[in-house]
């Protein structure tokens, strides 16, 4: 298992540390480190502290903050920035931009699992500027060009 440096900024995380929910889980659950419940009305967004700071340090890694599927499907709670990207040299607290795209007021409870953190490999590339590409089967075919279903 790859290891990264982490600071637990909220003392409650000592009893609820970031963890994988199962052996096959890709994401670590992030908790809402709030002092009191927050009401999120339809269409509103708010920044929720995770109580966690990470430093990936390795430029070959990045972390993504992703929504929890149940919150999105059942309550319309997704991320305000859709995907949060954390660079390897960032060392600050991880915040979650929470957006209520549902029709009902949603209450974010203190220490509720609000999002998930997935660490992924990153390949930094350089560009070769060209006038033309070598021909491929797809060419410039864009949206819908490979079929309907």
UniProtKB/Swiss-Prot annotation:
Substrate binds at residues 68-70, 81, 85-87. Pfam families: dUTPase. InterPro entries: dUTPase, dUTPase-like, dUTPase-like_sf, dUTPase_trimeric. One of its GO terms (biological process) is dUMP biosynthetic process. Keywords: Hydrolase, Magnesium, Metal-binding, Nucleotide metabolism. Pathway: Pyrimidine metabolism; dUMP biosynthesis; dUMP from dCTP (dUTP route): step 2/2. It comes from the Bacteria. SUPFAM superfamilies: dUTPase-like (SSF51283). The keyword Hydrolase applies. Gene3D superfamilies: 2.70.40.10. The keyword Transcription does not apply. It catalyses: dUTP + H2O = dUMP + diphosphate + H(+). Its cofactor is Mg(2+). Its EC number is 3.6.1.23. GO terms for molecular function: dUTP diphosphatase activity; magnesium ion binding. It is an enzyme of class 3 (hydrolase). This enzyme is involved in nucleotide metabolism: it produces dUMP, the immediate precursor of thymidine nucleotides and it decreases the intracellular concentration of dUTP so that uracil cannot be incorporated into DNA. HAMAP family: dUTPase_bact. Belongs to the dUTPase family. This is Deoxyuridine 5'-triphosphate nucleotidohydrolase. The gene is dut.
């Amino acid at each position: 298992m790859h290891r990264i440096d982490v600071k637990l900024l909220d003392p409650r995380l000592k009893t609820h540390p970031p963890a994988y929910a199962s052996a096959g889980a890709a994401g670590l659950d992030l908790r809402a480190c709030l002092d009191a419940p927050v009401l999120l009305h339809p269409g509103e967004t708010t920044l929720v502290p995770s109580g966690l700071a990470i430093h990936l340090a390795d430029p070959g890694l990045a972390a993504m903050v992703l929504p929890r599927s149940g919150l999105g499907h059942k309550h319309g709670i997704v991320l305000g920035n859709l995907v949060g990207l954390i660079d390897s040299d960032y060392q600050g607290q991880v915040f979650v931009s929470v957006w209520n795209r549902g029709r009902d007021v949603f209450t974010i409870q203190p220490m509720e699992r609000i999002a998930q953190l997935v660490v992924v490999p990153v390949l930094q590339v350089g560009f070769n500027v060209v006038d033309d590409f070598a021909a491929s089967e797809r060419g410039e075919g864009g949206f819908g060009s490979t079929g309907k279903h």
